[in-house]
């Protein structure tokens, strides 16, 4: 499958959904599924300009751990527990259902601290034009240890940036967010422009496709997609399901 995350694709804009290799759990079917289950489906998107978003590095509680096929598991939301099961949220920062799911997932991470690993990975959807730029902004913030702060900011302000079509305007707004969060805006903007910034997002996307993720939010335990959980699930439901799937009593 051809990757949608080449620099050329980022500069050109969105690729056709068919080129991304995912069924459109988010075309006509997605809206009905979303309203029924609280999750918005869709195929992954490459609609972003390299000048519209950032890269990142690790923080104590929300760090990007190195791996994928080399061990990468995404951003950690709690302490690493070697050998323990891993619960992962596949998210899209423009998805309104992800905005509802992530705070609960963060609470679940606290309850599972020292018991299970809890991580977040990217799954930008083709139906969301600014999903990749938003993911880039989170990556850029992570470079300064503020992945979680930027993610929360983007979820809280979705209506302010989701419809922006001008790349420079989007870039300026994300830089304003970075300033509000106390980031070095020069370094943040440099990360947005860096072609390396897209790589963790691409890695997350490819891994999501590999394990069968078709929409967001999607929860997985040890790379097994979990059915029956969505943005309407309670924190207790998340915790109990994750523990059961990981064999934790």
Where does each model-flagged region fall?
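Surface-exposed charge patches
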Residues: 139, 176, 206
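Short clusters of hydrophobic/aromatic residues that line enzyme substrate/ligand-binding pockets
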Residues: 77-79, 161, 226
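Internal amphipathic alpha-helical segments of the cytochrome P450 catalytic fold
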Residues: 22, 147-151, 185
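Flexible, active-site-adjacent loop/turn segments at secondary-structure boundaries
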Residues: 70-75, 153, 190, 224
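Structural alpha/beta surface segment adjacent to cysteine/selenocysteine redox centers
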Residues: 88-94, 99-173
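C-terminal cap of thioredoxin/glutaredoxin-like
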Residues: 2-5, 27-37, 41, 45, ...
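Extracytoplasmic thiol/disulfide redox context detector
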Residues: 2-127, 241-249
